[in-house]
Amino acid sequence: MTTNLERDRNQQRLSFGQAAAAYDEIRPSYPREAVAWSLDGHDRTVLDLGAGTGLLTLVIGQVAETVIPVEPDPGMRAQLEARTPGVIARAGSAEQIPADDSTIDAVLAGQAYHWFDHEKAHVEIARVLKPGGVFAPIWNIRDERVAWVQALSDAFEGRAMPGYNRQVEKATFGDLFGPVEARRFDHSVTTTADGMVALMSSRSYFLTADDDTRQAMTAKVRDLVAPLGDQFELPYVTYCFRAYKL
């Protein structure tokens, strides 16, 4: 039986395709050093799980011999292939990965692990990984040590999926993997009030909201960033987690 939470999760998970081009333009990329740490030398054949528009795929391609993006949303796959000539995105999900057993050196997941059915996904990820292969979820998170960023998060936290961005901190990846290691990387992007509105408009809670709610959220964002001037730095922390297949 499907619960309301599961229905909400599925609706949000598949909402991004309608804004694929905007997502591609405004979501931050990942520091190369964060990806290199996540791979830990397992860089021959890397699978980007829940690849979206290919933000992480591009960075993986800079440090790995072969990258295989996997994405369930056709709109996101089309955008990925448009921005990464020669790369073919495979249709699939964390619960049904289109790869043979023991053929992948590393599986990375950028901004995606919180959408997975973890029990099923852990088994599938372990199936496709070679012995000793690495699984590494990654998140770009706004740096809430900065006061205005914390205020922004406080304003919209209740609209995100429960546990979003925090559910790996004390987790394991099941009996098929060893202990989870973690590391963080600080970085920032230069943006504007319009850029912040565009960033919020790519969030699942905005994409699935009604028009009145969207207008209210947009006004709130503009109010929060108005004191920051025409351009300002949006600070991020990239959180990386990795564990090795036993």
PLM region spans:
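Conserved class I S-adenosyl-L-methionine
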Residues: M1-G50
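Residues at the starts of beta-strands that form the adenosine-phosphate
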Residues: T45, T66, V134
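Class I SAM-dependent methyltransferase SAM/SAH-binding core
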Residues: T53-Q96
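A short acidic, Gly/Pro-enriched loop at the edge of an enzyme's catalytic core
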Residues: E95-A106
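A short SAM/SAH-binding and catalytic strip from SAM-dependent methyltransferases
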Residues: D105-E119
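Conserved catalytic/acceptor-binding region of the Class I
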Residues: K120-V189
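Conserved Class I S-adenosyl-L-methionine
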Residues: E169-L246
